UniProtKB/Swiss-Prot annotation:
Lineage, highest ranks first: Bacteria, Pseudomonadati, Pseudomonadota, Alphaproteobacteria, Hyphomicrobiales
Chief localization: cytoplasm
Pfam families in the record: Acetate_kinase (PF00871)
Binding positions for substrate per the UniProt entry: R93
Annotated active site: D150
Alphabetical keyword list: ATP-binding, Cytoplasm, Kinase, Magnesium, Metal-binding, Nucleotide-binding, Transferase
HAMAP family: Acetate_kinase
Protein name: Acetate kinase
Segments traversing the membrane: none
Length: 398
């Protein structure tokens, strides 16, 4: 009986998973299958695809299926479908680790209690990340679970890059910049030498993780030195339904002049803003790019503008720029967004190769051969990054 590792990413209405062979440190070739249970709270859809993309399992679960029920269904399906394998450990994507965790950690009751303290700092993700851990602990109390944090990659940011201009006592209480999407940035940092060469990896690189959630990270020698997200995953770039950077005075105005409650403002900023709020149409970039509605065009223009502005800021933090990397769902697949960003980055030395950008599939260079700053698109794989952390911490890696 061979060991397998399970990677879980639990959200408000879904549980996504990936299953890997665990006889050696996982690579993409060790993926057995992946999928998830979506539309929880409505008509849950359970779909699994094999590593080659073919459908392995596709069904609907009863309406009213809870997150805990869905977890039991998923684990039961894995154990029934793969009797020749032993589930040896589970890795969870956990968005916020605060200042407590600088790397993956074995989950204990004490760790769970510490993670619960961050629920209000990442309301779209953290409560559901931790609930999945708790549900699985009830199902399999002896199964090792490992929490892998989106904040950990930024744990050693320079102090000046983490500080807000607030009274020192608040800073000492943990009100500071943490940064997110760290599992994605960690994966890209590991891929850079192979895709772009060691010289690029050792240089001044800005990585743009563009998806429903979006952020950017300035890397020097593949280490984070500045990032756009802050105390929460609400800060920085405009996102699918999140506002990104916002004058705090707007929040005070909404509280005092519009008599909105804190929860109403949270819903507005996290769930009703960004591409969705500006366009009034959708939080999906594909839908907006296909639309001729002027509000869709305005949303796209603002999205690109914010990226271009933050790129200049991060280049300043690096003292220059050697390479720009796109990743995430939009960064990997939306060549039009890459084109617009690169055109606005021409002053930094980015010269796009239009044909390479339009035809790229997978990882590769999209800038012209004579571009002073090279530009790349590299697919990310947060699940694989988590699987590697789990393997290293669990029995197979010891």
């Amino acid at each position: 009986m061979s060991d397998v590792l399970l990677v879980l990413n639990a959200g408000s209405s879904s549980i996504k998973f990936a299953l890997y062979e665990a006889h050696t440190e996982p690579t993409a070739d060790h993926l057995i299958c992946e999928g998830g249970i979506g539309s929880l709270g409505h008509r849950p859809h359970f779909k699994v695809v094999n590593s080659d993309g073919s459908t392995r399992y596709d069904t609907y679960l009863p309406e009213g299926t809870s997150h805990d029920d869905a977890m039991a269904v998923l684990i039961g399906w894995i154990e029934t479908t793969f009797p020749e394998h032993r589930l040896s450990a589970v890795g969870h994507r956990v968005v916020h680790g605060g200042a407590l965790f600088d790397g993956p950690v074995d989950v204990t009751p004490e760790v769970i209690a510490q993670l619960r303290a961050f629920d209000r700092l990442a309301p779209l993700h953290q409560p559901h990340n931790v609930s999945a851990i708790e549900a699985l602990a009830k199902l399999h109390p002896s199964l090792p679970q490992i929490a892998c944090f989106d904040t950990a990659f930024h744990h050693r940011l320079p102090e000046v890059a983490t500080a807000f201009a607030l009274p020192r006592e608040l800073t000492e209480q943990g009100v500071r910049r943490y940064g997110f999407h760290g599992l994605s940035y960690e994966y890209i940092a590991g891929r850079l030498p192979d895709v772009a060469g060691q010289a690029v990896a050792d240089g001044r690189v800005v990585v743009a993780h563009l998806g429903a959630g979006a952020s950017m990270c300035a890397m020097l020698r593949c280490r984070s030195i500045a990032t756009t997200m802050g105390f929460t995953a609400l800060d920085g770039l405009m996102m699918g339904s999140r506002c990104g950077e916002l004058d705090p005075g707007v929040v005070l105005y909404l509280l005092e002049e519009k008599s909105m409650t804190a929860r109403e403002i949270e819903d507005l900023l996290y769930r009703e803003s960004g591409l969705l709020g500006v366009s009034g149409i959708s939080d999906d970039m594909r839908t907006l790019l296909a639309s001729d509605d002027p509000h869709a065009c305005e949303a796209i223009e603002l999205f690109v503008y914010r990226i271009a502005r933050e790129l200049g800021s991060l280049a300043a933090a690096l003292g220059g720029l050697d390479a720009l990397v796109f990743t995430g769902g939009i960064g990997e697949h939306a060549s039009e967004i890459r084109r617009r960003v690169c055109e606005q980055a021409a002053w930094l030395g980015v010269t796009l190769d239009p044909d390479a950008n339009a035809s790229l599939s997978g990882a590769g260079r999209i800038s012209a051969p004579d571009s002073k700053v090279s530009a790349w698109a590299i697919p990310t794989d947060e699940d694989l990054m988590i699987a590697r952390h789990v393997w290293r911490l669990a029995d197979g890696g010891r």
